[in-house]
Amino acid sequence: MVYQVKDKADLDGQLTKASGKLVVLDFFATWCGPCKMISPKLVELSTQFADNVVVLKVDVDECEDIAMEYNISSMPTFVFLKNGVKVEEFAGANAKRLEDVIKANI
């Protein structure tokens, strides 16, 4: 499942609901070409690993406060959280790395 976060309170609620699962925060922008390219792979992976992974998309233009909190400077940036703790982060539309990091952390 891929869910687009509306604001900080929404993100906090989603993180609480995802307790025990790997959370992938996808920081993106609607105008970002690489973000659009990686999006179908992210949907595919969220379906493939639905029992263990929650994908939360964060539009950096709509949720600037969240992007600032996570020090996001380029898109897409993926932040991986487990039980509220960051376990990995990388920037760029690298589908292989995205899949590898998910598999390594579920």
From Swiss-Prot:
The keyword Ubl conjugation does not apply. This is Thioredoxin-2. Disulfide bonds join C32-C35. The keyword Oxidoreductase does not apply. The record marks D26 as: Deprotonates C-terminal active site Cys. GO terms for molecular function: disulfide oxidoreductase activity; glutathione disulfide oxidoreductase activity; protein-disulfide reductase activity. Keywords: Disulfide bond, Electron transport, Redox-active center, Transport. Participates in various redox reactions through the reversible oxidation of its active center dithiol to a disulfide and catalyzes dithiol-disulfide exchange reactions. As a reducing substrate of peroxiredoxin 1, thioredoxin 2 is preferred over thioredoxin 1. Residues 1-106 form the Thioredoxin domain. GO terms for cellular component: cytosol; nucleus.
